[in-house]
């Protein structure tokens, strides 16, 4: 059985566990570096990206996560997790993990639209996926190897680059598991 980790330092962890299990895989809440060795793919959940970064630094996760990526293992960042994956963040000099060739802007839908739902068409996933956006970032630019999977009002809200998948919204907060299943298929392909 595939083992999918959810970085369990902060954020929407249990909801991801539920969606992984609903797709028939085993979920592992990753709180220690050595747990990275036992999983086939990793979800970086939503939460607060600066808090998550502080905790990643405190527990020494940055380098091991880069090594996990270098080993070819898939990673899926949702909301704050997308910010962690990005090579460039608007208004910041340094990225967090800097793995995915995208530029993201934090809280980019404005305070008035702090949270909202929108129907999205996501390439390879669904034409009618309800995206739950909470203080969401969006992808401002993508590198040439990056495939744009979804846009909302002209803004990129989901993308994939090889083993990396990222989205602005929270797929784990609905009972629609198709985005999680798409990631599990990526993990299956990477293992094959």
Swiss-Prot record:
* E.C. number: 4.3.3.6, 3.5.1.2
Gene Ontology molecular-function annotations: glutaminase activity; pyridoxal 5'-phosphate synthase (glutamine hydrolysing) activity
Q: Cite a single GO BP annotation.
A: pyridoxine metabolic process
| GO CC annotation | cytosol; glutaminase complex
Q: Does the keyword RNA-binding apply?
A: no
Q: HAMAP family from the entry?
A: PdxT
Family statement: Belongs to the glutaminase PdxT/SNO family.
Q: Say what the protein does.
A: Catalyzes the hydrolysis of glutamine to glutamate and ammonia as part of the biosynthesis of pyridoxal 5'-phosphate. The resulting ammonia molecule is channeled to the active site of PdxS.
Designated name of the protein: Pyridoxal 5'-phosphate synthase subunit PdxT
Which taxonomic lineage does the organism of this UniProt entry have? Bacteria, Bacillati, Bacillota, Bacilli, Bacillales
């Amino acid at each position: 059985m595939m083992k999918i980790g959810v970085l369990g330092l902060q954020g929407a962890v249990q909801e991801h566990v539920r969606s992984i299990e609903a797709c028939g895989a085993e979920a592992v809440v990753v709180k220690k570096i050595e747990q990275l060795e036992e999983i086939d793919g990793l979800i970086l959940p939503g939460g607060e990206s600066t808090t998550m970064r502080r905790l990643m630094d405190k527990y020494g996760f940055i380098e091991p996560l880069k090594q996990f990526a270098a080993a070819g293992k898939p990673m899926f960042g949702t909301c704050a997790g997308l910010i962690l994956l990005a090579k460039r963040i608007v208004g910041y000099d340094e990225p967090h993990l800097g793995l995915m060739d995208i530029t993201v802007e934090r809280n980019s839908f404005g305070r008035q639209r702090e949270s909202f739902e929108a129907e999205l068409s996501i390439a390879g996933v669904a034409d009618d996926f309800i995206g739950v956006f909470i203080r969401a970032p969006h992808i401002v630019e993508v590198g040439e190897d990056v495939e744009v999977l979804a846009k909302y009002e002209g803004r990129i809200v989901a993308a994939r680059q090889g083993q990396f998948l990222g989205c602005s919204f929270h797929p784990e907060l609905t009972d629609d598991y198709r985005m999680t299943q798409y990631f599990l298929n990526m993990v299956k392909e990477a293992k094959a």
